[in-house]
């Protein structure tokens, strides 16, 4: 049986799904890509206006309709509540950080006053405004080539993208600055993929489970649980970053932040706990953010 791997049709999405296809073939499972068009691929409105699941619901619908056997998502795009219809596998995470692609090799600090920077993510907008209130932040949608092309053409001075995406399509050298999470905190589960199949497909589950990376799973789950407990969606100005440390890599450090869209206020809290219990640590961090006033910032 040849597995039908559903993916969005962008260069980045097909590259990501292609890597998963090749890994499955390495484990002896034949697979091919099936392109599924999502509302987010055809509607260039701000993502928060299109609705929840803008990049993922069409793939899940295709799974339910038996049009595909496996769906490959960017984990950060999935709704935060687990869906009992699907089995989830999370492979090894790429670099979670954000990157700046600027003209003339400039860093954020070196951009001239009033420079035009493109991004549509509220999380990035709020943090950029806190770091550089003088910048003109402009909305930006489209694939990686389209976004970076606005810098090449001079329409924008810089854009901010996920470094993982740049790396996956071989464009990591275009980054003029890669932000430390302490400077620009990434989105929950940024850089991680989510692979889903139907829960009743036991043979497919056995094959997909070979791709599971436990450390990526627990750190991404911790970050996304913060988002869930804050009752915020993937487009909210919320960031989170988890790492595993300790002698056996069994201690998790989880930092999360909630930001005012105008950059005027930010709430950040960090805590450590057992890596094997990511939800408990996330609930602790979310509770502290709520106590500090996160609900007010989230509107």
Curated annotation (Swiss-Prot):
The remark listed among the other comments is:
The porphobilinogen subunits are added to the dipyrromethane group.
Q: Which UniProt keywords apply?
A: Porphyrin biosynthesis, Transferase
What the entry lists under PANTHER family is as follows: PORPHOBILINOGEN DEAMINASE
State whether keyword Transferase applies: yes
Report the superkingdom from the record.
Bacteria
List the lineage, top down: Bacteria, Bacillati, Actinomycetota, Actinomycetes, Mycobacteriales
EC number of the protein: 2.5.1.61
> What is its biological role?
Tetrapolymerization of the monopyrrole PBG into the hydroxymethylbilane pre-uroporphyrinogen in several discrete steps.
The name under which this protein is listed is Porphobilinogen deaminase
Annotated GO biological processes are: protoporphyrinogen IX biosynthetic process
Under the subunit heading, UniProt states: Monomer.
Q: Which reaction does it catalyse?
A: 4 porphobilinogen + H2O = hydroxymethylbilane + 4 NH4(+)
GO cellular component term of the entry, any = cytoplasm
Q: Name one Pfam family in it.
A: Porphobil_deamC
| UniProt similarity note | Belongs to the HMBS family.
The free-text note explaining how the cofactor binds reads: Binds 1 dipyrromethane group covalently.
Gene Ontology terms, MF aspect: hydroxymethylbilane synthase activity
**S-(dipyrrolylmethanemethyl)cysteine sites (modified residues):** 234
Q: Which NCBIfam families match?
A: hemC
Q: Does the keyword Transferase apply?
A: yes
Q: In which pathway does it act?
A: Porphyrin-containing compound metabolism; protoporphyrin-IX biosynthesis; coproporphyrinogen-III from 5-aminolevulinate: step 2/4
Its required cofactor(s), as named, are:
dipyrromethane
